[in-house]
Amino acid sequence: MTDSTCEGAGEDGDGIQWLAEIGGPHPGGPHPGGPAAGGPDADGEVGGVVFARGIPPRELARRMGADPAAGTEPISGTDIRDLDIEVYRPGDDGDGVIRVGECGGWSFAIEYGDSTGGELLTEIARDGVEVVHFRPMPEQRPALLDYARDGAVLCGFGLGEERWRWGQEPDLLVPDLVAASVLEPDGITPCASAAGAGAGAAHCRTLGAVERRFGLSLPRAALDGLRLPAYAVRGTPGMEPR
């Protein structure tokens, strides 16, 4: 089986600003304790997207816990709903599934169910690999972004809460956020123009800053009709359509 790319979606995909459509604002203060596990769901909705530069898609799947020889034939995002995925098991792990591909020089994994991208972030990022992890967090907002490299989380923040940051270099992306009119030059105060634009537009600015910094892109079709190989990364999901 060969690894899938974003062929058919345009050479550079669709950027990543559109991922704001599956995230959202958080009504309170900073995300407690920094990054947390994403909130999977039972209906095939996306629990996160992992981008990795420096490894092919199959190796990304392996680092996320998959048997690299056990990928399915390419399936669409809608086909995920036909797999037997038990998201939650009392006292045990739920099932985690990913679909993997490559776009713009980055491998990507789209996460479903009880996936592993958050807890294995530093493992994915070892040996010089760069990783950007986006989690929409629909049940526990804000949506979260983390950047890791060489086995360490360098920086992370919530969309709309960029002034609260974590990681070994929490201010790494501040110049990019300032240039995108997300934050004022002090790196703390939100730009008035971003606040007045509404949450969706403000989140697009943040994702646009990350997109430009790292050259990230993901075709919209990857969440829908684009067919990509799928892997089990946790639990015992049924990988044959029901």
Residue ranges of model-derived segments:
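Elongated, non-catalytic scaffold/linker segments and compositionally distinctive motifs
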Residues: 1-4
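Hydrophobic alpha-helical segments that drive targeting, anchoring, or assembly
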Residues: 8-182
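Long, compositionally biased intrinsically disordered terminal regions
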Residues: 13-16, 22, 141, 146-242
